[in-house]
Amino acid sequence: MSAKDVKFAADARERLIRGVDILANAVKVTLGPKGRNVLIEKSFGAPRITKDGVTVAKEIELEDKYENLGAQLLRQVASKTNDLAGDGTTTATVLAQAIVREGAKAVAASLNPLDLKRGIDLAVAEAIKDIEKRARKVQSSEEVAQVGTISANSDAAVGKIIATAVKKVGNDGVITVEEAKSLETELDVVEGLQFDRGYLSPYFVTNSDKLLVEFEEPYILIHESKLTSLQPLLPVLEAVVQTGRPLLVIAEDVEGEALATLVVNKLRGGLKVAAVKAPGFGDRRKAQLEDIAILTGGQTISQDLGIKLENVTLSQLGRARRIRIDKENTTVVGGTGKKKDIDARIAQIRAQIEETTSDYDREKLQERLAKLSGGVAVIRVGGATEVEVKEKKDRVDDALNATRAAIAEGIVPGGGVALLRAKAAVSKLTNPNPDIQAGIQIVLKALEAPIRQIADNAGVEGSIVVGKILENRSPTFGFDAQKEEYVDLIEAGIVDPAKVVRTALQDAASVAALIVTTEALVVELPKEKAALPAAGAGADF
């Protein structure tokens, strides 16, 4: 076991706070509409320029081990807020720094750190109640665009694209952000249910110019196992031929005699047919096939259910308005499944999302939910250079996360005003223990920190802005740092998601209170490098 170095009391806290300040000062310059960018050197490739707080925080590693402990703790604030709300990381960092600074002063004045923490916790709980009470539901596409615009650093085009994406795929739809090869930022929406399996043979293609299979009003055979022989398939093929409609076969695999027969039928023009592999593997494949069956009003042909392929009738096949298959993807549009069955399946997947502890499983379940309930949208971010595209993608990611948070828990006046207004509720708290009361006062002061920083970044005196807002009785009155004027924030479209504000305060207080109660630091001493052995004769040649 390697030797350790230990620091105590004031010396330990001073070093921790130095680390907190270094990280916080680098992050907080990005706050607000007039926040600046941070340029980050990368060990390989071009440097990265960003205005995203958590990206800056993750890049900071300090040489002094004690200071680095403080920076790492503050980085946790940004990371946790990003994980839970997806935005508000800079606000959380500014709040944490303010609580740490005031808390350290109180501890230096011989107040009890544990009582201070109790006071901080009481005040934060009261502030969160006030924020939740002020939140109002997002009611229009315009409000969704406003949230996106603010989080994307007042980029109205980004807000508009996100609002369009949400409108098209719904609240349960999946929206992803990718880098584009062009200069423009575009929105690509996939209607219906899409899975990543293409046609098994190019002979199935119906549109030879675009190499696509396109069917109108097809039947869909959903089979869980491999199809290799022709005999079990014949009754289904004969029944479908009588209707004159196309047939899509989805199975674990289609090969040998079965595939050859389907291809020959297609080429001779007797039956419009195509075959694709089932998506996923194992239990996940079973679940996805069941999703397709429910969406199309069909039945999964499975030995587990005792259904034999040779006994399948037309009523057990799924149906859809349209199907489009390319080399890599299959898209089913307008499935004819019953609404109550689809709603029941959606409710079941939602329950699984709530219960799962695995991030990977949650992501896959959300994809299935999106495919059943709305669709998938892809925002392709364009720009002139790689650096510009990456910077813009950071802002679009933030805006998208903020929009989801706003839909989940509603919106509050932005620009740090929701936190400032929460002071009124917190100031009513009283406690006979003076140290706990001091903890409440720490939070009261910290609640002003974000709005002061937004004003400072805009070149305006923060204390004047705070004073003017508190003088006005209107809960939506605030400071528009972009135009440097006082406005009704809701009318001006300057709003924040309540979830982002709440999470930022919770996470900031949680870590900051732990730093305040820290009394000793333990770090590993650097190991001395052994001297290299003397070079032998002739080593210079």
Curated annotation (Swiss-Prot):
The keyword Nucleotide-binding applies. It catalyses: ATP + H2O + a folded polypeptide = ADP + phosphate + an unfolded polypeptide. GO terms for molecular function: ATP binding; ATP-dependent protein folding chaperone; isomerase activity; unfolded protein binding. GO terms for cellular component: cytoplasm. It comes from the Bacteria. Keywords: ATP-binding, Chaperone, Cytoplasm, Isomerase, Nucleotide-binding. ATP binds at T30, L31, G32, P33, K51, D87, G88, T89, T90, T91, G415, D496. Its EC number is 5.6.1.7. NCBIfam families: GroEL (TIGR02348), PRK00013.1 (NF000592), PRK12849.1 (NF009487), PRK12850.1 (NF009488), PRK12851.1 (NF009489). Together with its co-chaperonin GroES, plays an essential role in assisting protein folding. The GroEL-GroES system forms a nano-cage that allows encapsulation of the non-native substrate proteins and provides a physical environment optimized to promote and accelerate protein folding. This is Chaperonin GroEL 2.
